[in-house]
Amino acid sequence: KHVGLNVASDPLGTLTYLGVRGSLVVYSADDPSMFSSQNEQDNRQYARLFGLPCFEPATAQEMKDMTVAAFALSAQMGMPVMVRATTRVAHSRGVVELGDIRPKAGPRHYEKDYAFVPLPGNAVRHHKRLVERMRSLVPVSDASPFNRVEGPADTRLGVVASSAAVNYVLDAVKECGLSDTVGVFRLGMAWPLPENALLEFLRGKDTVLVLEELEPLVEEALRAMAQKNGLTLTILGKGTSDLSTLYEYTPA
């Protein structure tokens, strides 16, 4: 649960420096509208703060697929990976194709390694390594099948959406007969952002609406990205007061 990760945040902030052997996936479910929680914090902020790759599923199938991808990425990069859901996605139902069930790995022998002791001498090297790893993940995010455009990409109006908002906007575009005039960038690997793929989507747009649960993390990054690359377009969202940072999105 999102507030539970607050309790684990002290060791998590060190663990991203140390790295892991094998795989470690942190599954965190946020609670927009506080249906059973004391706050509605956005735990994607931990991904940005500590340096965690972060997946954001929008459907039951993506919950499974992204979890598998997260374990694989964790093993490949030697670092913990986050899967961030929200109440609406966590409570969803759907037909899920499981794919191959892998055999269990055999027993492993524990090896004491002082490189995993979080002392300053190690931390100095580990921080540099973490920064390099996160930079190397940008092209991975660019190539991720979870980051893709639904509908035409060369429209003047676009939407960037993640989590449950993906489902709402795709339904709205279809029901309003806008499938040929609105392109939707479906953001599944939310951190680090797929910078090149997003820039390609932004180019040629007059207006882009950003839909994300809770804080405008993606929206702010898109504005910085557009300014850095000399793109002149209007980016609408929570930072422009067109949407609220309060509560969850609904189909209405």
Identify the meaning behind each predicted range.
Residues 57-252:
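Flexible, low-complexity linker and terminal segments
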